[in-house]
Amino acid sequence: MSAPTVVRRPRRLLPKLLRVGSRGIFGTLGIRLRGRGVIPREPALLVANHLSWTDIVAVLATHECTFVAKREVRRWPVVGWLATHLGVIWTDRTRSRSLLRTIADIEATLRGGTSVLMFAEGTTGDGTQLLPFKSSLIEAACRAGAPVVPLAITATALPPVDALCWVGDQTLLQSIPRVQRLSMPEVQLHAAPPIAPVSCRKVLTQMARDAVARRTRGGAIRARDRARSDATVRVSAALS
C-alpha cells in the first residue's frame, strides 16, 4: 500500500475568512441559516446527509473543519483552489486504493486537531428519503479515537423547494440560479450528541444514520409555511 499523502492543515486565517465568506454567500442568495445542537470544538468526524453544494457552505459558516470531496472538484475554477488550501481530503471513487488512502488521510487530519466533514450517503439526495450510509470512511474515527457527530442537514422554502437539491447532471452554474429564485429558503443544521468511537465502524455508521434519520423524519426538504416565515432566523450561537 502506498504511503498516505501529507495532510495540510487549514491556514489559521483561511477558516475565519471562509466563515465570513460563507455567511456572505448565504446572505447574497437570501438563504437563512439556523443551527441546533452543539458541534464540539475537539476534533470530530462530522457525518452528514447530503442535499446540495449549500451543505458545505452552511457547515463552513458555523464550524471550522475540512471535508472529504471527490477528486474532480480539484479541477473546478476557484473552488478547487480554495478547497486545496482548506486542506480538503480528496478521494477517487473509481480506484479501490484511493479508499485506503482517504481513510489514512482522515485519521491523520483528526489526529492533527482538525474536524472532518463527510457526506455518508456518497452522493446528493432529493431530500425525500435518507440513502444508506457508507461505513468505510468511519473507520478513520475509530483509528484516531475521535468522536462521530451525526449532522442532519434539512432545508425549507416556499415551493418549488426541490430547487435546493443538487441532483442528476446539474452543474454548479445551473444550480445557483435555481437557488436564487427560491422564496424564503432556509437551511438547518441539526447536530446530534457525539458518539464515542468504541464500537465497530458498521455499528457506528448505523448509530449515526439513525440519529440523522430522527432529525430528517418527514423528509430533509420541506415546503415552508408562509405564515411562519416572517421571523428573522440567525445562526445559533451554540454552533459558532
Annotate each language-model stretch with its function.
Residues 213-240:
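Cytosolic-facing loops and C-terminal tails of multi-pass membrane proteins
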Residues 17-44:
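A short, well-structured juxtamembrane/interface segment
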Residues 90-92, 192-197, 211-214:
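Polar-ligand-bearing catalytic/cofactor-coordination segments
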Residues 89-110:
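A membrane-cytosol interface segment of integral membrane proteins
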Residues 109-138:
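Catalytic-site beta-strand/loop segments enriched in glycine and acidic/polar residues
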Residues 2-13, 26-28, 42-96:
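Catalytic core of membrane glycerolipid acyltransferases/transacylases, capturing the structured
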Residues 79-80, 128-207, 218, 225-226:
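A cross-family acyltransferase "interaction/gating" segment
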